């Protein structure tokens, strides 16, 4: 049986449409751990914008977009208070090294829909400025408003998410994988078979009809980059690394005006 998952969650048994599965997802939220599926260890400087969102331990990823702002997925922070969050950065390890900073404010998208996972984007303001400008701590550039990753172009996904859907152990080091963008129309047709919709605020990436490479639980909110630009945030999928169901990502290019409107200095 395949499973529908938000990539910060424990696996979800799902024989029905996305909406039904996500009702359970909301109960299980924030208890997943994770690795990139079929990735490799990231090296210093590969993803200096990557951060780990933590309460008592890692539960989601995020991206540094300014020295006091993190971009992540709305489903990662739903129901959480800023005071409960710590951000670890400037390290390839989610559980040691680098630096930590507390969150002071959480800004979830006002139109985030937990049934369809549309508008799955959020910002976290840090209580103090992060020390950036080092090999493993740099803000990533944002795309132009309205930009959309081109089909067949490649993106770099990084995170500490699970090796396979439902797995529980975390990798020691940050993982990375490169996958191609899948045409939205094709992806939408495939996901239609399981009652899910790929909106204009999402895009898909993976090796269609082959699978094997993907983000998975624990990677949610983390960066999807193309040529040093943050084009996406890890969002959800039907299982992990399935041949017909590539990973689904928040299309950051549709939210630049929203980000600037929240006072982010980009």
Curated annotation (Swiss-Prot):
InterPro entries: Peptidase_S1 (IPR050430), Peptidase_S1_PA (IPR009003), Peptidase_S1_PA_chymotrypsin (IPR043504), Peptidase_S1A (IPR001314), Trypsin_dom (IPR001254), TRYPSIN_HIS (IPR018114), TRYPSIN_SER (IPR033116). Its EC number is 3.4.21.4. GO terms for molecular function: serine-type endopeptidase activity. Residues 16-35 form a propeptide. The record marks 214 as: Required for specificity. The keyword Signal applies. The keyword Cell membrane does not apply. Residues 36-260 form the Peptidase S1 domain. The active site is at 75 (charge relay system), 120 (charge relay system), 220 (charge relay system). Keywords: Allergen, Disulfide bond, Hydrolase, Protease, Secreted, Serine protease, Signal, Zymogen. One of its GO terms (biological process) is proteolysis. Disulfide bonds join 60-76, 187-204, 216-240. It catalyses: Preferential cleavage: Arg-|-Xaa, Lys-|-Xaa. Residues 1-15 form the signal peptide. One of its GO terms (cellular component) is extracellular region. It is found in: Secreted. PANTHER family: FI18310P1-RELATED (PTHR24276:SF98), POLYSERASE-RELATED (PTHR24276). Belongs to the peptidase S1 family. This is Trypsin Blo t 3.
């Amino acid at each position: 049986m395949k499973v529908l998952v938000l990539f910060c969650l424990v696996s979800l048994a799902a024989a029905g449409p996305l909406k039904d599965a996500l009702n359970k997802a909301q109960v299980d939220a924030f208890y997943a751990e994770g690795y990139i599926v079929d990735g490799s260890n990231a090296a210093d400087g590969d993803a200096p914008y990557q951060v780990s969102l933590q309460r008592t331990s890692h539960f989601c990823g995020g991206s540094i977009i300014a020295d006091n702002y993190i971009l992540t997925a709305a489903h990662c922070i739903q129901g959480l208070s800023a005071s409960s969050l710590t951000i670890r950065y400037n390290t390839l390890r989610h559980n040691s090294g680098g630096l930590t900073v507390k969150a002071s404010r959480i800004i979830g998208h006002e139109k985030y829909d937990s049934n369809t996972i549309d508008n799955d984007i959020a910002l976290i303001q840090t209580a103090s400025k992060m020390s950036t400008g080092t090999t493993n701590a740099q803000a990533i550039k944002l795309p132009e408003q309205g930009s959309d990753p081109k089909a067949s172009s490649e993106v770099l996904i990084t995170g500490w998410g699970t090796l396979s859907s439902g797995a529980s152990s975390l990798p020691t080091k940050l993982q990375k994988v490169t996958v191609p963008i899948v045409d939205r129309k094709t992806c939408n047709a495939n996901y239609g078979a399981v009652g899910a919709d790929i909106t204009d605020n999402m895009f898909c990436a993976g090796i269609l009809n082959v699978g094997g490479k993907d983000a998975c639980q624990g990677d949610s909110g983390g960066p999807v980059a193309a040529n040093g630009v943050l084009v996406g945030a890890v969002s959800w999928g039907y299982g992990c690394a399935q041949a017909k169901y590539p990973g689904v990502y928040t299309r950051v290019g549709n939210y630049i005006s929203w980000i600037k409107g929240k006072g982010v200095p980009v």
